[in-house]
From Swiss-Prot:
The lineage of its organism: Bacteria, Bacillati, Bacillota, Bacilli, Bacillales. It comes from Halalkalibacterium halodurans (strain ATCC BAA-125 / DSM 18197 / FERM 7344 / JCM 9153 / C-125) (Bacillus halodurans). Keywords: Glycolysis, Oxidoreductase, Thiamine pyrophosphate. One of its GO terms (molecular function) is oxoglutarate dehydrogenase (succinyl-transferring) activity. SUPFAM superfamilies: Thiamin diphosphate-binding fold (THDP-binding). This is 2-oxoglutarate dehydrogenase E1 component. The gene is odhA.
Length: 945
């Protein structure tokens, strides 16, 4: 065989001498008139182009040297090549990949008469023409076709014609058709595999028998998933991977926890007995299993373990915590992997080493095509800011979703079909063939190692019981479950196979099973002896209960000035857009005289000082490099060459990395990714910015299930910062509201901080405070309503002195107002942009007497600043009422959350009332004129006696 790689896309390699001459002559006829040759030849010429002037060098051919001048013979060759291509492309349709639904096979697809061929025709075709990577036993064309059928239509099948990269397709052809990907298991390895399957099955049987009727979401029918995970983890660690991350739903999770993560059986049994002995558990944050104070059901919990291979290589294996929201853990695990791959200890962009971490995502067959977050996550796989060098996707395919069958759950032939749009190679494998399953995993890992791309395995099995163990599946799928109940388990099938080969005897098989059951029974009895009937509710850690520490976050003026000057130095040859350069250079004057620091500069200075302190930063979002409102400009573009320059990545005094990326048009996957990144890199200030805050609800599942509650459920800390542009400016219901009320309704137990700042200095200080609490027990997410039109408003800009001293203030009092304490009758509380609108009115009507009113801005809405407000209230003895003023409708914004808190903070007998929009189903008006009228009304009524 030639040393050059060939595929069936190079069909002319089988022609030489006179035969090649005939092909050349026919091609010349085709060029003159395509209709002058037969349909098959025309199709061949269209697909493969002209024959070469000379045939490629050959080292093997079964073709005789006899001259061929008959075009019919060429037609036979073309037909044979077409057959070979069809086997490669459509062999999966005839493959034995369904353990239960055998009738789906289309075994007659490759009958020779369908292609106008006989065995004699094919036998004369050179092997190289049909299967250039065939093993030595393939002697002629017929052998080659039979070999291809053996390769592509048995218990493992392949789809990769949708992969456009020729090198990848050639590699896959070679690996598959040569058999290089197949495991060469020794007798001991086969026995070990049987032992593993016995562990998996025995565990499920024990749970089923011991904890009757309790939910466990059994793996039975997909038992081979566990040895597959064993194998891929082994290969990854052997290749130097130091972090392997797994994301999966509840199906089979307990088995994976027990056998892949090594979660002790006694812990799992204790969870079934509702008698957890927490004294046995590792402390929060250590490698092991963490529990929050409210906890979660056993089949949602994650775990960590340290693993070591035979070469003493060490790695961390992580199974991510996961709620019942199927597939949403996928981008979180990708964030884990990216965080583990990056070195953030040096200035500049983080340095990524993809071999440091490998992500494995286990999907459900109904959820993979059903949940949009799947394709959002797949879309990240090749993006600069999000790629992780290839993930392994495994669809745990039991051909059903609860009670919904495939014809009601997807519009595609396979549940894996959405992956084709991302050119991900797909392997379908019968879960009843454990050795084929290991082969699929090996191929997947080798592909990732070589091409640094995703790979998908469709593990096709069945579900032995109902969706959960209290469900009776025969009610809705009676026919299928008649078959399943008679179907032997994969352990039974594999043990019989080994017995038949003489590798093991039946007595040893039974002994393995007995040993597993004896061990489980012994552990269970020990668990019963140690059980406790105490069910005391846990409480949050004291660091959470006590709230955030009071930290001075000011930075010396000289330091800020030096940083500012350095960030405005660009490479000599770099040409910034002239208009932008003029705007940015104005920042040079900020530190001279009475200069003001606007919002964007305050952010940049905060970032620079945080980097100087040694804290890495990662900022992503749609248009975040420039900023939606053209205010940030953290990445500059050369107006002549389109080269880019990020001043913060060139900052000489940084002691950690800085990353900023424009994200794809996605909220769900991106918020999940950034949350995962921050969880795995807790020392990093990770910020996600919505294009407009209105679009943050595209990630509502992430906020509900992870960001707000992850620590309470799982002990999973996060310091993620979410920047949500918010404010009513006449832009309609889709560009006004970040749905502040939704974040406030989730606020409890000091789970996160919610702020709406009205000055650049406040933003500077809150960012620095957030960076200071990272990787401590006081850490929590920060949800920030950020400005839009106020970004350039001078009333929001701050003096340099405000950045150099003090700290973030939870409340701000309106300057030059409320100075006559005895005269104040009304205190107006507000938050965000409405405060600036009120200030504008007072300044516009400065000739009026405003001594009767005082305005207080609530900069931090949660935790609610009760004590600071009470101190303010106490200064005004003649106050008659406290008014909460807001832009948002009455059933939205902060009012539904703060009204009871204000009443509890207010002096006895003081009326607390509301000013703002009325109750609405839509957050804002679409007509800018009506918007303006409403804004004017709110301001007027708030400031009218």
């Amino acid at each position: 065989m030639s040393s050059k790689e060939h595929t069936s896309e190079e069909p002319w390699q089988g022609f030489y001498g006179p035969n090649l001459g005939v092909a050349v002559e026919l091609y010349e006829e085709y060029q003159k008139d395509p209709n002058a040759v037969d349909d098959e030849l025309r199709e061949a010429f269209e697909k493969w182009g002209p024959p070469p002037a000379t045939a490629p060098e050959r080292t093997q051919s079964t073709f005789t040297a006899a001259s061929i001048t008959d075009p019919d013979v060429i037609k036979k060759f073309v037909g044979a090549v077409k057959l070979a291509d069809h086997i490669r492309a459509f062999g999966h349709l005839a493959a034995d990949i369904q353990p239960i639904l055998k009738e789906q096979r289309r075994e007659d697809m490759f009958d020779l008469d369908r292609f106008g061929l006989t065995e004699s025709d094919i036998r004369s075709v050179p092997v190289d023409l049909l299967c250039p990577y065939a093993p030595a036993h393939v002697k002629n064309g017929l052998d080659a076709i039979n070999h291809l059928k053996e390769v592509y239509t048995k218990t493992i099948a392949f789809e990769f014609v949708h992969v456009t990269d020729e090198e990848e397709r050639k590699w896959l052809n070679r690996m598959i058709e040569s058999g290089l990907y197949l495991p060469n298991l020794s007798t001991e390895q086969r026995k070990s595999l049987l032992k593993r399957l016995t562990d998996v099955e025995g565990f499920e049987k024990f749970l089923h028998r011991t904890f009757v009727g309790q939910k466990r979401f059994s793996i039975e029918g997909l038992d081979t998933l566990v040895p597959m995970l064993d194998e891929v983890v082994r290969e990854a660690v052997h290749e130097g991977t130091t972090n392997v991350m797994i994301g999966m739903a509840h199906r089979g999770r307990l088995n994976v926890l027990a056998h892949v993560l090594n979660k002790p059986y006694e812990m799992i049994f204790a969870e079934f007995l509702h008698s957890l002995n927490k004294d046995l558990f590792p402390s929060e944050g250590s490698i092991g299993i963490n529990y929050g104070w409210t906890g979660d059901v056993k089949y949602h919990l994650g775990a960590d373990r340290q693993i070591r291979d035979e070469n003493t290589a060490e790695a961390r294996l992580t199974l991510a915590n996961n709620p019942s929201h199927l597939e949403f853990v996928s981008p979180i695990v990708e964030g884990y992997a990216r965080a583990a791959q990056e070195d953030r200890t040096s200035p500049g962009a983080p340095e990524q080493d993809i071999m440091k971490a490998y992500s494995i995502l286990i999907h459900g067959d109904a959820a993979f095509p059903g949940q949009g977050v799947v394709t959002e996550t797949l879309n990240l796989s090749r993006l600069t800011g999000y790629q992780t060098g290839g993930s392994l996707h495994i669809i745990a395919n039991n051909n059903i979703g609860f009670t919904t069958e495939t014809f009601d759950s997807r519009s595609t032939l396979y549940s894996s079909d959405p992956a084709k749009g991302f050119e991900i190679p797909i392997v379908h494998v019968n879960a009843d063939d454990p050795e084929a399953c290991l082969a699929a995993v090996h191929l997947a890992f080798q592909y990732r190692k070589r091409f640094k791309k995703d790979f998908l395995i469709d593990l096709i099995g069945y579900r032995r019981f109902g969706h959960n163990e209290m469900d009776e599946p025969a009610v809705t799928q009676p026919g299928v479950y008649q078959i399943i109940r008679k179907h032997p388990t994969v352990r039974e099938l594999y043990s019989k196979q080994l017995v038949k080969k003489g590798l093991i005897d039946e007595q040893t098989v039974k002994q393995l099973d007995d040993e597993v059951q004896d061990k489980l029974q012994s552990v269970y009895e020990e668990t019963l002896r140690n059980r406790t009937d105490e069910h005391l509710p846990d409480t949050p850690p004291v660091e959470v209960v006590n709230g955030l520490p009071k930290l001075d976050t000011g930075v010396q003026s000289e330091t800020l000035k030096a940083i500012n000057n350095e960030l405005l130095e660009w490479p000599e040859s770099f040409s910034v857009n002239p208009k932008l350069e003029k705007i940015l250079k104005r920042r040079l004057n900020v530190f001279d005289g009475d200069g003001k620091v606007d919002w964007a500069l305050a952010e940049t200075l905060a970032f620079a000082t945080i980097l100087h302190d040694g804290t890495p930063i990662r900022l992503t979002g749609q248009d975040s490099e420039r900023g939606t409102f053209a205010h940030r400009h953290l990445v500059l573009h050369d107006s002549r060459t389109n080269d880019v320059h990020s001043p913060l990545q060139s900052f000489r005094h940084a002691n950690a990395s800085f990353a900023v990326h424009n994200s794809p048009l996605s909220e769900m996957a991106i918020v999940g990714f950034e949350y995962g990144y921050n969880v795995f890199a807790p020392e990093t200030l990770v910020l996600w910015e919505a294009q407009f805050g209105d679009f943050a609800n595209g990630a509502q599942v992430m906020f509900d299930q992870w960001v707000s509650a992850g620590r309470a459920k799982w002990g999973q800390k996060s310091g993620l910062v979410c920047l949500l542009p918010h404010g009513y400016e006449g832009q309609g219901p889709e560009h006004s509201s970040a749905r502040l009320e939704r974040f406030l309704v989730l606020a409890a137990e000091n789970n996160w901080t919610i702020a709406n700042c009205t000055s650049a200095a406040q933003y500077f200080h809150i960012l620095r405070r957030q960076a200071a609490i990272l990787n401590t027990d006081s850490v929590r997410p920060l949800i920030m309503m950020t400005p839009k039109s106020l970004l350039r408003n001078q009333k929001v800009a701050s003096s340099v002195e405000e950045l150099t001293t003090g700290r973030f203030k939870t409340v701000l009092e309106q300057p030059n107002l409320g100075e006559s304490h005895e005269k104040v009758e009304r205190i107006v509380l507000c938050s965000g942009k409405i405060a600036i609108d009120l200030q504008d009115r007072i300044e516009k009507e400065a000739d009026k007497d405003w001594d009767w009113v005082h305005i207080v801005r609530v900069e931090q809405l949660y935790p609610f600043p009760k004590e600071p407000l009470q101190e303010i209230f106490a200064r005004y003895p003649n106050v008659k009422e406290i008014v909460w003023s807001q832009e948002e409708p009455r059933n939205m914004g902060a009012w539904p959350f703060v009204q009871s808190k204000i009443r509890r903070a207010a002096p006895n007998g003081i009326n607390v009332r509301y000013e703002g929009r009325t109750y609405r189903s839509s957050p804002a008006e679409g007509d800018p004129i009506i918007h303006k009228q409403e804004q004017e009304r709110i301001v007027t009524e708030t400031l009218t006696r």
